[in-house]
Protein backbone atom coordinates (compact mmCIF):
# COMPACT_ATOMS: atom_id res chain seq x y z
CA UNK A 1 0.00 0.00 0.00
CA UNK A 2 0.93 3.62 -0.05
CA UNK A 3 3.70 4.04 2.40
CA UNK A 4 4.89 7.46 3.49
CA UNK A 5 6.48 8.40 0.34
CA UNK A 6 8.51 12.18 -3.63
CA UNK A 7 7.18 10.20 -6.59
CA UNK A 8 6.30 9.80 -10.18
CA UNK A 9 3.38 8.07 -11.80
CA UNK A 10 3.81 4.36 -12.15
CA UNK A 11 5.63 3.48 -15.35
CA UNK A 12 4.70 0.13 -16.90
CA UNK A 13 8.21 -0.20 -18.31
CA UNK A 14 9.66 -0.14 -14.81
CA UNK A 15 7.49 -3.09 -13.83
CA UNK A 16 8.88 -5.08 -16.74
CA UNK A 17 12.34 -4.88 -15.14
CA UNK A 18 11.31 -8.01 -13.25
CA UNK A 19 11.41 -10.76 -15.84
CA UNK A 20 12.05 -14.42 -16.42
CA UNK A 21 12.52 -16.65 -13.39
CA UNK A 22 12.13 -13.74 -10.99
CA UNK A 23 8.77 -12.80 -12.43
CA UNK A 24 7.69 -16.44 -12.34
CA UNK A 25 8.63 -16.57 -8.65
CA UNK A 26 6.55 -13.46 -7.97
CA UNK A 27 3.63 -15.01 -9.82
CA UNK A 28 3.83 -18.12 -7.63
CA UNK A 29 3.96 -16.01 -4.47
CA UNK A 30 0.98 -13.96 -5.65
CA UNK A 31 -0.97 -17.13 -6.44
CA UNK A 32 -0.14 -18.51 -2.99
CA UNK A 33 -1.31 -15.29 -1.34
CA UNK A 34 -4.59 -15.36 -3.27
CA UNK A 35 -5.28 -18.99 -2.36
CA UNK A 36 -4.24 -18.42 1.27
CA UNK A 37 -6.48 -15.37 1.51
CA UNK A 38 -9.50 -17.29 0.25
CA UNK A 39 -9.14 -19.82 3.08
CA UNK A 40 -9.51 -17.11 5.72
CA UNK A 41 -12.89 -16.67 7.38
CA UNK A 42 -13.50 -12.94 7.51
CA UNK A 43 -16.04 -11.81 10.09
CA UNK A 44 -17.74 -8.43 10.10
CA UNK A 45 -21.14 -7.37 11.39
CA UNK A 46 -23.61 -5.60 9.11
CA UNK A 47 -22.57 -2.09 10.15
CA UNK A 48 -18.88 -2.92 9.72
CA UNK A 49 -19.54 -4.49 6.33
CA UNK A 50 -21.25 -1.31 5.19
CA UNK A 51 -18.34 0.86 6.35
CA UNK A 52 -15.73 -1.47 4.83
CA UNK A 53 -17.54 -1.19 1.50
CA UNK A 54 -17.93 2.60 1.71
CA UNK A 55 -18.10 3.87 -1.86
CA UNK A 56 -19.85 7.25 -1.73
CA UNK A 57 -16.61 8.90 -2.85
CA UNK A 58 -12.93 8.00 -3.33
CA UNK A 59 -11.32 7.23 0.01
CA UNK A 60 -7.97 6.57 1.64
CA UNK A 61 -7.95 2.99 2.94
CA UNK A 62 -5.75 2.92 6.03
CA UNK A 63 -4.32 -0.22 7.66
CA UNK A 64 -1.33 -0.86 9.91
CA UNK A 65 1.73 -2.23 8.11
CA UNK A 66 1.81 -5.44 10.13
CA UNK A 67 -1.66 -6.41 8.88
CA UNK A 68 -0.89 -6.06 5.17
CA UNK A 69 -1.07 -9.80 4.58
CA UNK A 70 -4.87 -9.64 4.38
CA UNK A 71 -5.16 -6.33 2.52
CA UNK A 72 -5.43 -7.82 -0.98
CA UNK A 73 -8.19 -10.18 0.14
CA UNK A 74 -10.00 -7.32 1.86
CA UNK A 75 -9.86 -5.28 -1.35
CA UNK A 76 -11.12 -8.26 -3.37
CA UNK A 77 -14.08 -8.90 -1.07
CA UNK A 78 -15.13 -5.40 -0.11
CA UNK A 79 -13.66 -2.81 -2.51
CA UNK A 80 -15.30 -3.88 -5.75
CA UNK A 81 -16.40 -0.53 -7.16
CA UNK A 82 -13.05 1.28 -7.52
CA UNK A 83 -9.45 0.55 -8.37
CA UNK A 84 -7.02 0.78 -5.46
CA UNK A 85 -3.67 2.51 -5.98
CA UNK A 86 -0.65 1.96 -3.73
CA UNK A 87 2.61 3.87 -3.45
CA UNK A 88 5.75 1.85 -4.16
CA UNK A 89 9.40 2.85 -3.91
CA UNK A 90 10.97 4.20 -7.11
CA UNK A 91 14.11 2.19 -6.34
CA UNK A 92 15.13 -0.89 -8.29
CA UNK A 93 13.88 -3.09 -5.45
CA UNK A 94 10.54 -1.33 -5.77
CA UNK A 95 10.09 -2.91 -9.21
CA UNK A 96 9.60 -6.26 -7.47
CA UNK A 97 6.85 -4.91 -5.25
CA UNK A 98 5.24 -3.02 -8.14
CA UNK A 99 5.06 -6.21 -10.19
CA UNK A 100 3.71 -8.14 -7.20
CA UNK A 101 1.03 -5.51 -6.55
CA UNK A 102 -0.14 -5.79 -10.15
CA UNK A 103 -0.46 -9.54 -9.76
CA UNK A 104 -2.70 -9.25 -6.69
CA UNK A 105 -4.94 -6.57 -8.18
CA UNK A 106 -3.43 -3.31 -6.93
CA UNK A 107 -2.18 -0.50 -9.16
CA UNK A 108 1.29 0.75 -8.15
CA UNK A 109 2.38 4.36 -8.16
CA UNK A 110 6.16 4.61 -8.10
CA UNK A 111 7.93 6.96 -5.71
CA UNK A 112 10.17 7.42 -2.71
CA UNK A 113 9.23 5.42 0.37
CA UNK A 114 11.37 7.48 2.74
CA UNK A 115 9.41 10.74 2.86
CA UNK A 116 5.86 11.70 2.06
CA UNK A 117 7.07 14.54 -0.13
CA UNK A 118 5.37 17.10 -2.32
CA UNK A 119 5.51 15.00 -5.48
CA UNK A 120 4.15 11.95 -3.65
CA UNK A 121 1.22 13.90 -2.32
CA UNK A 122 0.54 15.47 -5.70
CA UNK A 123 0.42 12.13 -7.50
CA UNK A 124 -1.89 10.52 -4.96
CA UNK A 125 -4.13 13.59 -4.94
CA UNK A 126 -4.48 13.22 -8.71
CA UNK A 127 -5.32 9.53 -8.32
CA UNK A 128 -8.16 10.32 -5.92
CA UNK A 129 -9.45 13.17 -8.06
CA UNK A 130 -9.65 10.70 -10.94
CA UNK A 131 -12.10 8.69 -8.83
CA UNK A 132 -9.88 5.96 -7.36
CA UNK A 133 -9.15 4.75 -3.84
CA UNK A 134 -5.65 4.77 -2.39
CA UNK A 135 -4.19 2.37 0.15
CA UNK A 136 -2.00 3.72 2.95
CA UNK A 137 0.08 2.10 5.68
CA UNK A 138 0.56 5.09 7.98
CA UNK A 139 3.48 3.55 9.88
CA UNK A 140 5.25 1.95 6.90
CA UNK A 141 7.58 1.02 5.49
CA UNK A 142 10.07 1.35 8.37
CA UNK A 143 8.09 2.48 11.39
CA UNK A 144 8.03 3.18 14.22
CA UNK A 145 5.20 0.71 14.70
CA UNK A 146 1.77 2.26 15.24
CA UNK A 147 3.00 5.82 14.72
CA UNK A 148 1.07 7.84 12.13
CA UNK A 149 3.24 10.22 10.15
CA UNK A 150 1.49 13.59 9.63
CA UNK A 151 2.20 13.43 5.89
CA UNK A 152 -0.43 10.77 5.36
CA UNK A 153 -3.11 13.37 6.09
CA UNK A 154 -2.01 15.67 3.27
CA UNK A 155 -3.83 13.80 0.51
CA UNK A 156 -7.15 13.50 2.33
CA UNK A 157 -7.09 17.14 3.39
CA UNK A 158 -6.41 18.36 -0.13
CA UNK A 159 -9.26 16.25 -1.49
CA UNK A 160 -11.50 16.68 1.55
CA UNK A 161 -11.68 12.89 1.37
CA UNK A 162 -12.59 10.41 4.10
CA UNK A 163 -10.30 7.82 5.64
CA UNK A 164 -11.60 4.27 5.85
CA UNK A 165 -9.68 2.82 8.80
CA UNK A 166 -9.47 -0.96 8.54
CA UNK A 167 -8.99 -2.77 11.84
CA UNK A 168 -7.89 -6.39 11.74
CA UNK A 169 -7.79 -8.89 14.61
CA UNK A 170 -6.28 -12.31 14.00
CA UNK A 171 -7.50 -15.26 16.06
CA UNK A 172 -4.53 -17.43 15.09
CA UNK A 173 -1.40 -16.08 13.46
CA UNK A 174 2.36 -16.24 13.38
CA UNK A 175 4.27 -13.05 14.16
CA UNK A 176 7.58 -12.26 12.51
CA UNK A 177 10.52 -10.70 14.35
CA UNK A 178 10.36 -7.64 12.12
CA UNK A 179 10.16 -4.02 13.27
CA UNK A 180 6.35 -4.21 13.18
CA UNK A 181 5.92 -7.83 14.38
CA UNK A 182 4.22 -8.64 11.06
CA UNK A 183 1.20 -10.95 11.23
CA UNK A 184 0.77 -14.05 9.05
CA UNK A 185 -2.62 -15.64 9.79
CA UNK A 186 -2.98 -19.39 9.90
CA UNK A 187 -4.78 -20.85 6.88
CA UNK A 188 -8.52 -21.32 7.52
CA UNK A 189 -8.37 -19.12 10.63
CA UNK A 190 -10.86 -16.41 11.56
CA UNK A 191 -10.06 -12.79 10.81
CA UNK A 192 -12.21 -10.23 12.61
CA UNK A 193 -12.67 -6.96 10.76
CA UNK A 194 -13.62 -3.62 12.26
CA UNK A 195 -13.91 -0.30 10.53
CA UNK A 196 -14.19 3.40 11.19
CA UNK A 197 -14.81 6.04 8.55
CA UNK A 198 -13.25 9.37 9.46
CA UNK A 199 -14.16 12.52 7.50
CA UNK A 200 -11.39 14.94 6.61
CA UNK A 201 -12.77 17.26 9.30
CA UNK A 202 -14.56 16.47 12.54
CA UNK A 203 -18.02 17.67 13.56
CA UNK A 204 -16.54 20.98 14.71
CA UNK A 205 -14.90 21.60 11.35
CA UNK A 206 -11.43 20.89 12.74
CA UNK A 207 -8.89 18.97 10.68
CA UNK A 208 -7.98 15.47 11.82
CA UNK A 209 -4.58 15.11 13.45
CA UNK A 210 -2.15 12.20 13.23
CA UNK A 211 -2.95 11.44 16.88
CA UNK A 212 -6.67 11.25 16.04
CA UNK A 213 -6.02 8.68 13.33
CA UNK A 214 -3.61 6.68 15.50
CA UNK A 215 -6.05 6.46 18.41
CA UNK A 216 -8.95 5.41 16.17
CA UNK A 217 -6.91 2.77 14.34
CA UNK A 218 -5.43 1.30 17.52
CA UNK A 219 -8.92 1.04 19.02
CA UNK A 220 -10.10 -1.25 16.21
CA UNK A 221 -6.84 -3.24 15.79
CA UNK A 222 -6.22 -5.13 19.04
CA UNK A 223 -3.03 -7.15 19.47
CA UNK A 224 -3.01 -10.56 21.12
CA UNK A 225 0.40 -10.01 22.74
Spans of model-derived segments:
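A generic local structural motif
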Residues: 45-50, 72-73, 121-123, 179-181
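Catalytic core of membrane glycerolipid acyltransferases/transacylases, capturing the structured
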Residues: 57-114, 175
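Hydrophobic helix-cap positions at the C-terminus of alpha-helices
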Residues: 52, 75-78, 127, 220
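Short amphipathic alpha-helical segments and helix-helix/interface helices
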Residues: 49-53, 98, 152-153
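Conserved beta-strand termini and adjacent loop/short-helix elements that scaffold enzyme active sites
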Residues: 45-47, 89, 111-114, 196-198
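Residues that cap or initiate secondary-structure elements
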Residues: 48-50, 67, 92, 142, ...
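Non-catalytic C-terminal accessory region of glycerolipid acyltransferases
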Residues: 2-38, 103, 107, 118-225
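A short, well-structured juxtamembrane/interface segment
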Residues: 33-58, 67-71
Amino acid sequence: LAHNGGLQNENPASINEVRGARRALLWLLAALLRVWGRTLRFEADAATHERLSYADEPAALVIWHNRLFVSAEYFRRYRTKRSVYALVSASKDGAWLAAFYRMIGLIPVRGSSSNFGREAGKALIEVMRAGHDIGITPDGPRGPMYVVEPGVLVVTRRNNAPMVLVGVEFTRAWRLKSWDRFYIPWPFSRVILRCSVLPAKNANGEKLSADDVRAALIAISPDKD
